[in-house]
A protein has these predicted regions:
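Extreme N-terminal basic, low-complexity initiation segments
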Residues: 2-10
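Short, Lys/Arg-enriched N-terminal segments with co-localized hydrophobic residues
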Residues: 5, 19-35
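Short, intrinsically disordered, low-complexity terminal segments
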Residues: 10-11, 20
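Active-site anion-handling motifs in enzyme catalytic cores
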Residues: 30-409
């Protein structure tokens, strides 16, 4: 009723400019009834394109619905100290850290690597400052969150690999919203386990954490299977937040690029197969090879991009003629922008469930290639009409999930 009345009065103001005070009165009621304080907890600032863009996408989508949204500025040491050249983040280096000489040898080696990333780090810091709305308070431990939790109507965990049991964040109660006040609704959106199963040793912890959640959605089909193995029947699969925003929005959001006719490489592991596929299509089509790198360049690439931020990342994918990667979000945007692409598996088969689930969602499972592939049989013939329809169906379902969460608060 309020939505209907508000629409009527807004139309009256636009056409007749009357009923001013009634509109203001209804606005007050509307804000009280429908505007909520929402906090998001995710790995938002780890100098990763996908992590930054998915955090922004969920924040912006919820803001467009009229809500007050903040990302909890949670910076646990296991995530953020690895960008500190003086810090040891792996227990296997504990013994080295106890000796002065080896400690400084490690620091020098780490600094030598990190200095190549400083330009990229600056781009990410600017993106975070300009686009991510963080809580005023920064939290460094779960205990700090528990002692002084942010006040919100709803706290949303996700998206991305926040529940990956192979990483420390997958065993951190913070990412299961275990710190929230009793009256705060706890919801996950497109959270990812990033694996096909979790070990028996982790099941009790994960099940106990998820039992406190009000609503659960995950990003992968395998995530739903994991939930079922934990006796959690009400979990659903939704799309990554980057799909919540329209293609047109991303086109205006990205930095403008003018380069054309290139194969874009985004490779985490130095894949020899990716290199061979890139060189094959370079010979076949006459395209150049561009590579996005964390630090060290790909020597076979015609051009390496090391000082790029999330908006440049989008532009490079949007303007490429072909995309090759083992990145989930790189693949997601290639699909969304209707770019010819191939996906390469990461070492450790369980880590590939993210890409496999995405490709299954859009009926492009044949784009995941392995070592035994015949490169000469690879092609660039794509019919994205069906893909786009499938994306719209899943997007609508994902939005309905969020709508149901917000309406039942």
């Amino acid at each position: 009723l309020l939505r209907y009345l508000k629409k009527i009065f807004y139309n009256s103001v636009a056409e007749l400019r009357i009923n001013k005070y009634k509109v203001i009165f209804l606005d007050i009621i509307w804000e009280k009834q429908y505007t909520m304080k929402i906090c998001i907890i995710t790995c938002h600032d780890v100098y990763n394109f996908g992590a930054s863009l998915q955090a922004y996408a969920l924040q912006h989508y919820l803001e467009e619905l009229g809500h007050e949204v903040e990302i909890i500025d949670y910076r646990p040491g296991y995530l953020y100290k690895k960008y500190d050249w003086k810090s040891f983040t792996s227990k296997k280096f504990d013994k080295l850290n106890s000796f002065f000489v080896t400690r400084w040898m490690f620091r020098i080696a780490k600094w030598s690597y990190l200095r190549f990333s400083l330009g990229r780090k600056k781009c990410f810091d600017e993106f975070t400052k300009n686009y991510l709305k963080l809580t005023d308070k920064t939290y460094y431990t779960f205990e700090e969150l528990k002692m002084n939790p942010p006040c919100a109507d709803i706290i949303i965990a996700g998206s991305d690999q926040i529940w990956n049991p192979l990483f420390p964040n997958g065993k951190d109660p913070s990412y299961y919203i275990d710190f929230a006040l009793s009256q705060t609704k706890r919801v996950s959106y497109a959270a990812s386990f990033s694996v096909e199963y979790i070990s028996d040793a982790d099941k009790e912890f994960v099940k106990g954490m998820l039992a406190k959640m009000n609503r659960i959605s995950v990003r992968e089909y395998q995530g739903v299977d994991i939930l079922k193995s934990l006796d959690i029947k009400n979990g659903v699969k939704v799309l990554d937040p980057v799909f919540l925003l329209d293609r047109n929005y991303w086109e205006t959001f990205m930095h403008k690029g003018s380069e054309k006719d290139y194969i874009l490489i985004y490779d985490f592991e130095g894949s020899d197969l990716m290199k061979r596929v890139a060189l094959y299509f370079k010979r076949k089509k006459g395209w150049k090879i561009y590579s996005i790198n964390d630090a060290l360049p790909r020597l076979y690439a015609d051009k390496n991009f090391t000082k790029v931020g999330p908006q440049d990342f989008l532009s490079l994918i949007y303007n490429c003629s072909m995309f090759l990667s083992n990145s989930f979000h790189g693949t997601a945007f290639a699909v969304y922008f209707n770019k010819p692409f191939y996906v390469f598996g990461l070492k450790g088969i369980s880590l590939n469930s993210r890409m496999e689930s995405l490709l299954r969602s859009v009926d492009l499972k044949d784009r995941f290639i392995t070592e035994n592939i015949d490169i000469e049989k690879l092609h660039l013939n794509y019919d994205f009409n069906k893909v786009n329809l499938l994306i719209e169906e899943e997007k609508n379902y994902s939005k309905q999930f969020l709508d149901s969460v917000l309406k039942t608060n």
